[in-house]
Swiss-Prot record:
<dbReference type="GO" id="GO:0006231">
    <property type="term" value="P:dTMP biosynthetic process"/>
</dbReference>
<keyword id="KW-0808">Transferase</keyword>
<protein>
    <recommendedName>
        <fullName>Thymidylate synthase</fullName>
        <ecNumber>2.1.1.45</ecNumber>
    </recommendedName>
</protein>
<keyword id="KW-0545">Nucleotide biosynthesis</keyword>
<comment type="pathway">
    <text>Pyrimidine metabolism; dTTP biosynthesis.</text>
</comment>
<dbReference type="GO" id="GO:0005829">
    <property type="term" value="C:cytosol"/>
</dbReference>
<keyword id="KW-0489">Methyltransferase</keyword>
<feature type="binding site" description="in other chain">
    <location>
        <position position="21"/>
    </location>
    <ligand>
        <name>dUMP</name>
    </ligand>
</feature>
<feature type="binding site">
    <location>
        <position position="51"/>
    </location>
    <ligand>
        <name>(6R)-5,10-methylene-5,6,7,8-tetrahydrofolate</name>
    </ligand>
</feature>
<dbReference type="GO" id="GO:0006235">
    <property type="term" value="P:dTTP biosynthetic process"/>
</dbReference>
<dbReference type="InterPro" id="IPR036926">
    <property type="entry name" value="Thymidate_synth/dCMP_Mease_sf"/>
</dbReference>
<feature type="active site" description="Nucleophile">
    <location>
        <position position="156"/>
    </location>
</feature>
<feature type="binding site">
    <location>
        <position position="179"/>
    </location>
    <ligand>
        <name>(6R)-5,10-methylene-5,6,7,8-tetrahydrofolate</name>
    </ligand>
</feature>
<dbReference type="GO" id="GO:0032259">
    <property type="term" value="P:methylation"/>
</dbReference>
<feature type="binding site" description="in other chain">
    <location>
        <position position="187"/>
    </location>
    <ligand>
        <name>dUMP</name>
    </ligand>
</feature>
<dbReference type="GO" id="GO:0004799">
    <property type="term" value="F:thymidylate synthase activity"/>
</dbReference>
<comment type="similarity">
    <text>Belongs to the thymidylate synthase family. Bacterial-type ThyA subfamily.</text>
</comment>
Length: 274
């Protein structure tokens, strides 16, 4: 994952010191892009161990259109716990916008599948999670926003677009805000997997995953962890195997995915900025 290490180095060397909503402080750059050829292996960071279970279940949760953390908790995934209200609700976050835009019957994922199958040259194959009408009020708590019909958090990975050429499906993600140490490795793997899933159900080979950033930052309390990670040598990328029998994007289950030859360095703990 040279691309990811290059991003870390770029921010350390070129980043500006900036404050942020959480009060933690960051080193940040504005505008950066990485590209991953999915035929060269699954882009799962190897210089620290990632929790694949969380990545897969979160993606399946998005695709279900779910916005309550109960499904995640039932499957041992805790990455959204800090932002949910007492009932486990997060308000109209990613899954709601993907599957039920603005509370209307606009299923962006179904529309993408239809376009990929029937109009693959379309330049309108985008999914947006950025909905200004439900952005949270930063002056109140996460739970108050949810009670007011707003999202607990605004989407960081805001929208993505698909592109078909030469029988291959590629995806580009625009991420407006990126916690490079903790969040970005998850985001890379999640959208690479989504691209592979879409390719399978729509009859394409997986092409490239392109990851474009707005504000890409390293939190000030992650600097030691980043230096440790950069001291490690990246290892060969693993291979993601997907059950070839699944032909509907909404039919995937956790058991349909097998990651082979993943040999990462040990995990590196760090605090999430809340």
């Amino acid at each position: 994952m040279k691309q990811y290490h290059d991003l870390l180095k770029h921010v350390l060397e070129q980043g500006a010191q900036k404050g942020d909503r959480t009060g933690t402080g960051t080193k940040s750059v504005f505008g950066y892009q990485m590209r991953f050829d999915l035929s060269e292996g699954f882009p799962m960071v190897t210089t620290k161990k990632l929790h694949l279970k969380s990545i897969i279940y979160e993606l399946l949760w998005f695709l279900k259109g779910d916005t309550n953390i109960e499904y995640l908790k039932e499957n041992g995934v805790r990455i959204w716990n800090e932002w949910a209200d007492d009932n486990g609700d997060l308000g109209p976050v990613y899954g709601h916008q993907w599957r039920n835009w603005n509370g209307e019957e606009i299923d962006q994922i179904k529309e993408i599948v239809h376009s990929l199958k029937h109009n693959p040259n379309s330049r309108r194959m985008l999914v947006s999670a950025w909905n200004p009408s439900v952005l949270p009020d930063t002056s109140v708590s996460f739970s108050e926003n949810v009670a007011n019909g707003k999202a607990a958090l605004p989407p960081c990975h805001a929208f993505f677009q698909f592109y078909v050429a030469d029988g291959k499906l590629s995806c580009q993600l625009y991420q407006r805000s990126a916690d490079i140490f903790l969040g970005v490795p998850f985001n890379i793997a999640s959208y690479a997997l989504l691209t592979m899933m879409m390719a399978q159900v729509c009859g394409y080979e997986a092409g490239d995953f392109i990851h474009t950033f707005g504000d890409a930052h390293i939190y000030s309390n992650h600097m030691e962890q980043v230096e440790l990670q950069l001291s490690r040598e990246p290892r060969q990328l693993p291979i993601m195997k997907i059950n070839p029998e699944v032909k509907d994007i909404f039919d995937f289950k956790f058991e349909d995915f097998t990651l082979e030859d993943y040999d990462p360095h040990p995990g590196i703990k760090a605090k999430v900025a809340i």
